[in-house]
Amino acid sequence: MKIVIADDHAVVRTGFSMILNYQNDMEVVATAADGVEAYQKVMEYKPDVLLMDLSMPPGESGLIATSKIADSFPETKILILTMFDDEEYLFHVLRNGAKGYILKNAPDEQLLLAIRTVYKGETYVDMKLTTSLVNEFVSNSNQDTANTSDPFKILSKRELEILPLIAKGYGNKEIAEKLFVSVKTVEAHKTHIMTKLGLKSKPELVEYALKKKLLEF
């Protein structure tokens, strides 16, 4: 099977490439350092599996990239690499096209099993995070009302500028510098956006922005 590895740390890309290329049934055909490059590599190489880090640099979110790649290249199975810090994103990543996720510090044997599992079209879930995923599913199962709202009727022009930047992972200071406003202004707008849209977390905001097509690479 052909595999693309996307991670912003070169040492991780190199390490995983060595492990996978040692397998008779696996070949790493390309690597990528961010979400944008991952999309380009998948488009070029048409891999069977994309092994992708969820934590990407601002502007190139792993969640955003997952959604776009899954929509454009459904034949490529996406396996997410994650750390415990990313737990709140897991439900949203799986709902937006990933076939599974695995912890970065998982044993090599578990990584290989996860890759072969998603390659077959099955879902792989790291058992250490299953409880978090179930809890997130329960809390979100009846919480889709915000997704039906029209952002162009609810949000102000400035809020429509800020929302995509938040979703892409930019911090308050970076957004303030981009829009030439104060950090306090950005914080106030962020609060208003979450309140107006009925959102409770950043992953929900990212998913909302994706569904409303407010994000582009």
Swiss-Prot record:
Domain Response regulatory residue range list: 2-119
Record-linked SMART domains: HTH_LUXR, REC
InterPro entries: CheY-like_superfamily (IPR011006), Sig_transdc_resp-reg_C-effctor (IPR016032), Sig_transdc_resp-reg_receiver (IPR001789), Tscrpt_reg_LuxR_C (IPR000792), WalR-like (IPR039420)
GO molecular function annotation: DNA binding
UniProt KW keywords: Activator, Cytoplasm, DNA-binding, Phosphoprotein, Transcription, Transcription regulation, Two-component regulatory system
4-aspartylphosphate modified-residue sites: D53
Major place of residence: cytoplasm
Domain HTH luxR-type: 148-213
Gene3D superfamilies, A to Z: 3.40.50.2300
Subcellular location: Cytoplasm
UniProt cross-references to Pfam families, sorted A to Z: GerE (PF00196), Response_reg (PF00072)
Organism lineage string: Bacteria, Bacillati, Bacillota, Bacilli, Bacillales
DNA-binding region(s) from the entry: 172-191
Protein name from the UniProt record: Oxygen regulatory protein NreC
GO cellular component: a single term: cytoplasm
Functional description taken from the UniProt entry: Member of the two-component regulatory system NreB/NreC involved in the control of dissimilatory nitrate/nitrite reduction in response to oxygen. Phosphorylated NreC binds to a GC-rich palindromic sequence at the promoters of the nitrate (narGHJI) and nitrite (nir) reductase operons, as well as the putative nitrate transporter gene narT, and activates their expression.
SUPFAM superfamilies for this protein: C-terminal effector domain of the bipartite response regulators, CheY-like
PTMs per UniProt: Phosphorylated by NreB.
GO biological process: phosphorelay signal transduction system; regulation of DNA-templated transcription
